Amino acid sequence: MRVSAFALLAAAATAAATSVQGAAEGFAKGVTGGGSATPVYPTTTDELVSYLGDDEARVIVLTKTFDFRGTEGTTTAKGCSPWGTASGCQLAINKDGWCDNYQPDAPQTTITYDTAGMLGITVKSNKSLIGQGTAGVIKGKGIRIVNGAKNVIVQNIAITDINPQYVWGGDAITLNDVDMVWIDHVTTARIARQHIVLGTNACNRVTISNNYFNGVSDYSATCDGYHYWGLYLDGSNDMVTLQGNYIHHFSGRSPKVGGNTLLHAVNNYWYDSTGHAFEIAAGSSVLAEGNVFQNINAPVESSSLAGNLFTSPDSNTNKVCSSYLGHTCQLNAFGSSGSFNQADEGFLVNFKGKNVASADAYSAAQSVPNNAGQGKL
């Protein structure tokens, strides 16, 4: 019996749509998610929530848009305008008294927001959440991998439109008290606050790769259409690989690194920022190599720099990496961008013996905008 080439291609496409593609590099190397579990295909928001939150190992395939807006009604509450009252300025929800305690002089206002966006969908251990082509979208609500969850893969989905006008209106991806998590080929856009946040509890081993963090928005804390709240990595014992991501159109916190985070930022592409990319707090450590910074006003916020930073500044200095990472660190590249030149070496020993992502020359990162995000597997 002869099998047509079309049939073989169709079978391959189906297999690709129902299983994780590739494997995590870096700190989350070895993560398996739902493994070989029989794929399930939720059709309603309730089914999606149920599959993600149960105790079974699962491969969950999204074949449509799951729009959570309106599913939990709206909330009208007190808010404030700490960044101005122009039409492009984000407003702030008075969550946990934030306006009262931190912005008492800001103009007060009343806000009506979509309740579903405030708290993401809980994702438990041993899950693979994957999208089919470009069809898998979660709109109006993020995801939360928290409370001891382990061995989770999120790949090839989009998370969008979470109360974009209102700070404290919800985050796209939240990790807190987890281990072995891989976030890959995800697109995030029009988010209230953080596109991805690692909370103050230990998130341990995490790889964030090939994602498109899209900061274009009608509303921002800087009132200029550039989202400020990008990536916030603040765990107490975190090792994070940030690899091959397209980080576009942010005015700050892309990423903010704090807690006791060890971050390996490799072969990413930052493009178009009116503010800063890295913000590095005391106790955290960042190694950046093989990245491209194009039209980035400040690759690092120097006024607040209190942690460790190795920027792979020149070929001679970069040789020190080989003893700890197994390779000589790669130079970064800059176009119409600010200064990024620091060589703290003492923390590099923390990479020794760990799963460290490979690093290509910065020329490889030039292709990142075409390969990052949903539908680019």
UniProtKB/Swiss-Prot annotation:
It is found in: Secreted. The active site is at 253. Glycans are attached at residue 126. It holds the Pfam family Pectate_lyase_4. One of its GO terms (cellular component) is extracellular region. Keywords: Carbohydrate metabolism, Cell wall biogenesis/degradation, Disulfide bond, Glycoprotein, Lyase, Polysaccharide degradation, Secreted, Signal. It comes from the Eukaryota. Disulfide bonds join 80-99, 89-223, 321-329. Its EC number is 4.2.2.10. Residues 1-17 form the signal peptide. It catalyses: Eliminative cleavage of (1->4)-alpha-D-galacturonan methyl ester to give oligosaccharides with 4-deoxy-6-O-methyl-alpha-D-galact-4-enuronosyl groups at their non-reducing ends. One of its GO terms (biological process) is pectin catabolic process. It is an enzyme of class 4 (lyase). InterPro entries: Pec_lyase, Pectin_lyas_fold, Pectin_lyase_fold/virulence, PEL. GO terms for molecular function: pectate lyase activity; pectin lyase activity. Belongs to the polysaccharide lyase 1 family. Pectinolytic enzymes consist of four classes of enzymes: pectin lyase, polygalacturonase, pectin methylesterase and rhamnogalacturonase. Among pectinolytic enzymes, pectin lyase is the most important in depolymerization of pectin, since it cleaves internal glycosidic bonds of highly methylated pectins. This is Probable pectin lyase D. It comes from Emericella nidulans (strain FGSC A4 / ATCC 38163 / CBS 112.46 / NRRL 194 / M139).
